[in-house]
Amino acid sequence: MEGAASDPYRRPARRTQWLLSALAHHYGLDRGVENEIVVLATGLDQYLQEVFHHLDSRGAGRLPRADFRALCAVLGLRFEGAAAPGEASEDTAAGDTNSGDVISGDAAAGEAAEWDEDAEEEARLALRAEPPELTFRQFHARLCGYFGTRAGPRLPRGALSEHIETQIRLRRPRRRRRRAARPPGPDGGPDGERLARLEEENSSLRELVEDLRAALQSSDARCLALQVGLWKSQAGAQEAARGEPEAAARELRQARGALAAAEAQAGRLRRGQAEVRRRAEEARAAVLRSLGRVRELEALARQMPGLQRGLRLLEGELRRYRSEGTQLPGPSRASPEPDTKSSEPEDGEARGPEPPPEGAWGSGNSPASRPPGPARASPGLDEQLFRSVEGQAASDEEDDREKWQEAQRLPAEVTALLAGLSGCGSGCDDQTAKKLMTYCSHLGGANHAHTLGELETCVAMLVEQLGSRGCGAKTLRTPEEEAELQRKVGENESLRQELQMVEAERVRLSLLEEKLEDVLGLLQRLRDLNISKKALGKILLSTLDACRDPAHDGPSGPLAVLEALHRALAGCELLRREPSAPASTAPALPHSFPISG
């Protein structure tokens, strides 16, 4: 029970505490002395039976443990060392927290005077663990045992209250007592009549009190049952109210976690989008640079005909400059074939008549194709004769070639001097130089070999004559003409190299244009197949990453990037699943880059 400072029994009992006050008054805790409490305490068993009956709305004769704890909460009963009723655990194995208090109270009550049999039964039932459902005896024992362990002197039990407190009677309609009419006493008179009248009034008052007690008990039991139901509903609402903030807080934490995850995902997507945009800008800038270079090369290619015409003019001017100087005609070579007619008599005189060639004999079996003679030559003799003729002809041809080469060998000094004479620009005797060159051109036979010394002597005389005239052998042109000629030759070479570079660049751009057309064709096909932007961007980014990878050992440059992009697009799953279409049905690309040759 609560402490003395907040003990409700120190004050006049409220109606919600009638049951507590009646129990306290019955067990000697005389703290409420109101008349209704005294009246209710005279029939405590019926009072508890009314309360149990109203709480047992099912009529099963058993009260659930939750309802009993709710009743204790309504009454304000709190056992020492135990939680509030309704908050205790549902596990019966944990034991009844009230048992320790009852045991201690039982030990304290053992020092009191003698207990009757009902008190011992109540204490014994109170020691048991609280079952899931309570019968009326358990309900009665637990409520009475709580006060019995703390009880003082019990109220005296008289004969007038024995019919109420001796046993627990079942609830049934009350029967009025009918007293038999008393015969007048022997000592009749005013005193006897007055005594009889007082006894009758006492009996009537006792019955009235009993009726009032029954009505009060029934009314209070009904009120307690309603309060228990209200407390249970409020406890459920409070439990739900306590659980709702926790559930709301849990949902709020989950929502915040989901929001943080979504924000992180959005941040990653924004960073990825920025990276894709940056790489797309880089690719766009690279394509624009390539396009600008292509246009520059197109402009250079359009200038190529003019460059070719200028190159042809320069070549013609170079030839004209070269032909301005007087050049002697080169020595005409004599025929490498020796004069067979002139050599035939000498050879014939030395060797005699030659046998006819192999073709003259024929290879047939007819008599006309056979060689003349009295006897027919054998095949082995014909072959031997053919080989001897062929060897002799080869040796003669080799001798003639050696003679011709010796005749053609002029001294190097003579050739150099003649070339110097032909390029002299200071008024030398051109006719003499031409005659010498013509003379040298006719030196081809063996009979002219003895004139080489005379030719050298003549050339030396001409050189001395030229030296006396002030014309050196190596004075071909003036320094200004030589410088101009060298400048023209350098310009010609630079133009030729530039032309080669332009041609190589044109070929490279042609390859680049073809690869661009292939890539644009694949992109058009993928767009017709409704490829997603995410997949297309992923292909582009993976291609750029592969080309920018330092471990990439392949070629670099726009053509390599386009080649890698073409392979990546060609390996797309959509194109593999697409049925192969004929090449004639491929759409024409509007964005081609023509390069004029």
UniProtKB/Swiss-Prot annotation:
One Gene Ontology term from the biological process aspect of the record: positive regulation of transcription by RNA polymerase II
One MF annotation (Gene Ontology) recorded for this entry: calcium ion binding
Location of the EF-hand domain: 43-78
Biased composition (Basic residues): 169-181
Any one Pfam family match given in the protein's UniProt record, by short name: CCD48
Region (Disordered) residue spans: 85-122, 160-195, 322-380
Coiled-coil segments: 479-532
Protein origin, superkingdom: Eukaryota
Biased composition regions of type Low complexity, renumbered to the chain: 359-368
InterPro entries from the UniProt entry: CCD48 (IPR031601), EF_hand_dom (IPR002048)
Residue ranges, compositional bias (Basic and acidic residues): 336-352
Keywords linked to the UniProt accession: Coiled coil
Protein name, per record: EF-hand and coiled-coil domain-containing protein 1
Taxonomic source organism: Bos taurus (Bovine)
